[in-house]
Every structure is written in C-alpha cells, then in structure tokens.
C-alpha cells in the first residue's frame, strides 16, 4: 500500500557478490547468443582478476560495482559491447591495464567505449570544479559532456548505470562529498537521463539525490504521497476495476500498470502548487499498453466518453513525439476528489519510454527483441550524425554565435556562443548582471526592438542600452528561458512567490529618490490619477511597468510640488496606449487612450481570418470581438473600432490563439478519434471537446476548443479531416 522509495535501489543491500554474479549470468544467457555470452564472461573474468582485492568504502569487493553496472545495462537491453564495457569501465583508471592492453584483448569498439566513459567522467569532474561556486550546473555542462562522447549514446547510458550504482551506495562517503555528488547527479545526470528518454532512471537518480541533499523535504514529500495513497486507495481500486471492465467489454487486449509520481518530481510540483498536493494532476497514473496505435485512439475515445476528462492536461505524443522519440497519449480523468493520469501506448512505445535512446538499436546477436522504427534506426546509425547533431536531437537545442555590445562599452564587441533557445534577456543578464535592472533598450542590427521577447538568432548583432534608474519589469520573467537567471531576477524583485509584483510602492518611491523627488500627498495623487481615468495608485503602478518613458514622465507625474503635472497627461496616455498595442497583436490605433486590450472568449478571433475583428472601447479598455459576435447585441451604442492584425508582432512573438468550432456529420466508431488525431497532428493544442453522438441516426456533433496559429492552419486541419473520409460541416462558435 505504501510507496516504498527503497525500491529505487535496483539491488538488495543484502545481495552478495555471488548472488549478483549468478543473476547477471542467467540474464545474459537469456538475452544473448552463446558466442556473445562467452565474450561477456571473458570480460567478467578479466575485470574480476584485475580489480582483485580492491575494496569499496562499504567494505564490499570493488568488483561488485562494475558487475552491478553491467547487470543494469543487460536489464536496459544494451548491446554486448556496452555490457562488456560496463564490466571494464574502471579498469584503465584504477588498475595497471592500459588502453593498448584492452584493445589487444577485447578489440577497438569495446575499448573506445571504456575510454569515452573515462572522458565523460573526467569532463564531469572538470565541470564540477568549475561550477562549485555557482548555483546551478546549467545546460552548457551538458553540452561539454555530450560533445566529449561524440555520437555514442551508449557511452552516456553506460555512465548513467555507473552513476546510479554509485549514488545508491553513497552513504559510505563523507557527508560533504555526498552532497557534492548528489548535487551533480541531480543537476546533470538526472537531466541527461531525461533528455535521452530513460525516465525511470531519471526518477531513481533524482530521488536518491534528493534524499541526500534535503532529507527533511524528502521525508515530508514521501509522507504526503503515502497519505494520498491511503486516503484514495478505495477510489483507486474502483477506478482500475471500471477501466478493466470497459476494456474487456470492448474486447481490447491490454496490459495495465500503475505508478506513483517520483518523490523529487512531486516535491517540485508541490513548490509550484503552494504545497497543495491535490492540485498535482499526475500524482497517480495508470499505463495501458495495447497492441496497436489504432487501439490507442480507440481506447482514448472510450475513456473520453465514459469519464470526466480534464482536457487542459491532454497531450498526444504519438502524433507529435518528443525529441527523444517518446510516444504516448496522456489524458487525465477526474474522480471523486482525485485526478488520475492515464497513459496509453503500444508495447514498443512502452519499451522506448523506459529505455529511451538505448532501445533504438537492432542487434543481430539478440535472440529476440523489439524492433525500432526505420526512422530511428537510420538516424542513430547514420554516419552523418556528428556530435553537434546528436546534441541538438537529444537536448533540443543548438549552439549559435552572437555579437554583443552595450552603450556603456561602445567600442567593445563581445563574440558569444549561446544556446539557440536563448532570449535576449538571458544574454543581457549573463553579460551584465549588475546593470540588468536598468536595461532600457535593445537594438538588433542598429534598430530598436519594440518588445524584449525575442529569441537570439545566429550571427545576430545585439546592443544593450542602460539607463540610470531601475527599469525592471515583471513581464521580463516571461521573456527569459534560463531558469537560474529568472530566479535571480525574482530575488531582485523581492518576491519569491509565484506572482512576482514590481508594483509595490516602496520601489516606486525608491525610483523617485534616485531623481531627488518625493511622492505627492494622497489628495494630489487622487486628483492626478482621475485625470488619467485611473482610480487606484496600485492600478497606476501596474500600468507603468509596460511603457518606456524616455524622460521619466511616470515619476514626475506623481512627484510633490510639480505644478506642471497636467503637461504630462498627454505623453503618459500616449505611452500607455502605445505600450498596450505593442504588447498586443494588433496595429496601433491613433487618437484613442486605452490601458488594456481584452480578447473576449465569446467568439473566435484568429490571425488572417477573412472576417473583420473589431474592438469595443469601454472605460479605457478595448474589448475584442468578431464583427458579428452575438454579444454585440447586448451593447448600447458601443464605440466600435476596426482592428487589424500586426504581422510583425505575430512573427516576433508567435503564439497560439483560441479557436472554437462546431463540427456536425455522419458518425462512425472511428470518427471522433480521426478528428482528434488530425487536429493534434496539425500542430494545434486541443483544450476541450464536447461530443454529442446519436447512434440511431448515425450523427455526431462536436464542440471543439483548440489553440492554433492562424486561419491558414485551421483551414489546413479541416482539409485534412476531409481526407479521412468523414462527411461533415463546420462553423465558428
């Protein structure tokens, strides 16, 4: 009943060397041909001979470590060369055996693997030393390690097996060294495991590290998980029974597995959800492994028709696999007080989810095994796959070059290598952390950008311009991809909670002091805000975060003894309106004063649609509708303003827009699944689908809410649905 984290140890603490060796030989005999087993046994005997009487700090024979490492590799379905290298991976480093000796006995391929793992270990230690005073081992450490291993994914997998065994027996080291290794494991090796798709290994590495680094929160989180497990045990059992009955009634062959979220992952989500474990939608999960992709979608349709589904958590990784080839359908159902995530996948997909990239080779020496897709095998076996391509595929990014200068150092241009997903603000903080809060402008190729929400591009010329006063904006946090920099900016904002607010009066007063000014009294503030149509000071402070005020008009406006404050009304209104439009996706409308644009959800409005989009101006707020929206009938003499999409903003800050459609047509057993699959394959995000099915009349009706890029994408999706031999008509909602 209880979640026993000790199961994360792959081997019993009581298992002896003899028992582990017996288990290892049995499993190799089951998975490999006799001639391959002979090679592995040769490596085992060689490793045992040279490690001899060496002992671990636990008092165990040292040889038990490479043996357990190799056993993990067998269980992870790695090839014989990698298993042999696992047995031999410490030979060169810890004995008198040389690289030449190893090559003469076991050949170049096995020796190269041993050497590469040694290089990864060396690079890891080097990075540990370089980063020992930093808060985080960032992705650049991963770059160096991935590059050092060239295209050998199996070298990384071998290193993960090595590290997993070491972290499992870490208690024999000094406490300080435990923490250093655990920190590196959590921030580096667990990330690598996740990036190459070995999620169970990632969980083990993260949880074992977490227990060392923060035992108090580890135990608290474990206790909360167990409390939830006990509290909802009956509900959990009833739900599984319902699922099994539904599957059997529909004659679907399946295997059902259940899992509870890892402890460290749960702790991270508890931090985000303010310690409310009930808000974690995937704490409990059921995996349903079926025979085919068609069964996956058939089962998805059954679940959505028979249970209450939380569509915002629906994800189809079959139609859109992850970078590491992970495929599965995730959907979440709501029970009585309990959310349960259901993962639907085929047997091959399940194999990939457990072993990641390690599962994608086809080995002739294996007696049996699952075949990877031709695409995966061709990619991984390609002679063209250089280390840079390998890194990009696994880690989802690449390295680009940018040229950076600042107005404080006008004659100095810094050439910088950054990750391709770096934002301009990431680069600004990395180079100018002390001046970052005073950043006023950014220029690209000499032209000032209208929004700081820009991703760096190769060979981009960037200039940062700084002012004299604090210009930090709350929204900047959304414009940064580097989570370490983002956390530091949060600290600068003096807010560690989820909603970081720069709109606090003390910060405004501090900015006034820097200009030798004082805040006006309450009566003066009220009078001046009324002139802007603003009721509260807090509202004003929120609004001034967005615009750029070249002459600090927003500060002088509320300064005491400023008799010319009325002269500032017009430029402030202009700046506020301009900022609102610049942070929207519409062309600026001259001559109107607005403090907010609200895209209403009552009707569909997407870029490039032929229908006219309009704004209704009400109390300085521009509310966006479709020209024939039914809600307009309720408005009394509305001030209607035609709006036009801003192509530049859509290009610079791409996003998806809410689209609501109604589809009606001829129903069949596969209709709903085909439509859902087509929508997701069209690179859209499906939020909600409400089906109405009349089987007697063979009719269906779907109300669908999804997020898409533009009208062209919507039309493409609808045309694709037509190719599925579905008879239907559709309209906007």
UniProtKB/Swiss-Prot annotation:
UniProt domain HD: residue ranges? 62-167
Q: Pfam families this protein is in?
A: HD_4, RelA_SpoT
User: EC number(s) of the enzyme?
Assistant: 3.1.7.2
One GO biological-process annotation of the entry reads:
guanosine tetraphosphate biosynthetic process
Q: Which domain of life is it from?
A: Bacteria
Annotated GO MF terms: guanosine-3',5'-bis(diphosphate) 3'-diphosphatase activity
Q: Write out the entry's keywords from A to Z.
A: Hydrolase, Manganese
Which family would the database say this protein is a member of? Belongs to the RelA/SpoT family.
What this protein is reported to do is described as: In eubacteria ppGpp (guanosine 3'-diphosphate 5'-diphosphate) is a mediator of the stringent response that coordinates a variety of cellular activities in response to changes in nutritional abundance. This enzyme catalyzes the degradation of ppGpp into GDP. It may also be capable of catalyzing the synthesis of ppGpp.
Name this polypeptide is given: Probable guanosine-3',5'-bis(diphosphate) 3'-pyrophosphohydrolase
| Species in which this protein is naturally found | Mycoplasma pneumoniae (strain ATCC 29342 / M129 / Subtype 1) (Mycoplasmoides pneumoniae)
User: Which gene specifies this protein's sequence?
Assistant: spoT
